[in-house]
UniProtKB/Swiss-Prot annotation:
This is Chalcone synthase 3. InterPro entries: Chalcone/stilbene_synt_C, Chalcone/stilbene_synt_N, Chalcone/stilbene_synthase_AS, Polyketide_synthase_type-III, Thiolase-like. The active site is at C164. Pfam families: Chal_sti_synt_C, Chal_sti_synt_N. Its EC number is 2.3.1.74. GO terms for molecular function: naringenin-chalcone synthase activity. It comes from Pisum sativum. CDD domains: CHS_like. The lineage of its organism: Eukaryota, Viridiplantae, Streptophyta, Embryophyta, Tracheophyta. Pathway: Secondary metabolite biosynthesis; flavonoid biosynthesis.
Amino acid sequence: MVSVSEIRKAQRAEGPATILAIGTANPANCVEQSTYPDFYFRITNSEHKTELKQKFQRMCDKSMINRRYMYLTEEILKENPSVCEYMAPSLDARQDMVVVEVPRLGKEAAVKAIKEWGQPKSKITHLIFCTTSGVDMPGADYQLTKLLGLRPYVKRYMMYQQGCFAGGTVLRLAKDLAENNKGARVLVVCSEVTAVTFRGPSDTHLDSLVGQALFGDGAAALIVGSDPLPEIENPIFEMVWTAQTIAPDSEGAIDGHLREAGLTFHLLKDVPAIVSKNIDKALVEAFQPLGISDYNSIFWIAHPGGPAILDQVEQKLALKPEKMKATREVLSEYGNMSSACVLFILDEMRRKSIQNGLKTTGEGLEWGVLFGFGPGLTIETVVLHSVAI
């Protein structure tokens, strides 16, 4: 008779969960940040609000964003005028867009990840799909399974409306799945489309304008598994440790509410201060067991909620400017893509590390950290181990 402990041992992988491939995708429509205020106030019939437009221009100028990609084109917005008003009932119109576009964009990223992985898609055992928009049944996980032609018995996990910290959440979940299911290969997809949050400006709700200045659309996909097959699978990063915590005294710092007018976001001004105040504790918990206390000796992937968060984290920890280079590059070229952002940064870092002839996928360094920040205020922490190039 086989014991339960023997069964459990046989079910578990031997090595750590490893990122084996990364793919990214964006809508074709690219908007330049410098001219976006003109477009935004024109398409929302708000050009008479000259002072508000000047404020929005300053927000865009300070955002450290050069361009973003958006599903919403001028043509689509003209066909859906309710989406352009500040709080007009428009959820049906938004839903009709995102329930199609979220899985479609996710498929585009997933196809790239599967191609890089080099294994047949029939070997995918689990699917994690994450999006802030488009709640529907059956969900985007089901739609993606159909779009990709995955096996009907792939084990699916659907995460809706988690927000900007969820890039860390999907990695934490993928790690647990890969390490506790021998031979598992987990397809992770984060697909974010701002059609659910776009709306016209309001003089009385400047926090809504902040979101209009920062958010962009994008999807990222990973293949995660333990015990990579030699000569077949190519490890990129190993995931060593994960944690999630709610920052103390942070209730109401970041909220999102689904209304007839779409998804509304509410931000407090002290979000950067809350993040920087709590990041040291998260780092100590993560790196003390490794004997690491010099945070300039590790590579950094932080959700770029906005330049103020990155600035305050750098200042609090006395980080060298180059530590956030990959993070700032993604913010600059894509804006804040919510959960997908940190996965884009993983891709950016490994690509630049290879291009620059460095020794590891983590900018030549051995250890690194990935942070997700979002509603709650929730902080996700992932300790990464780079791979030799």
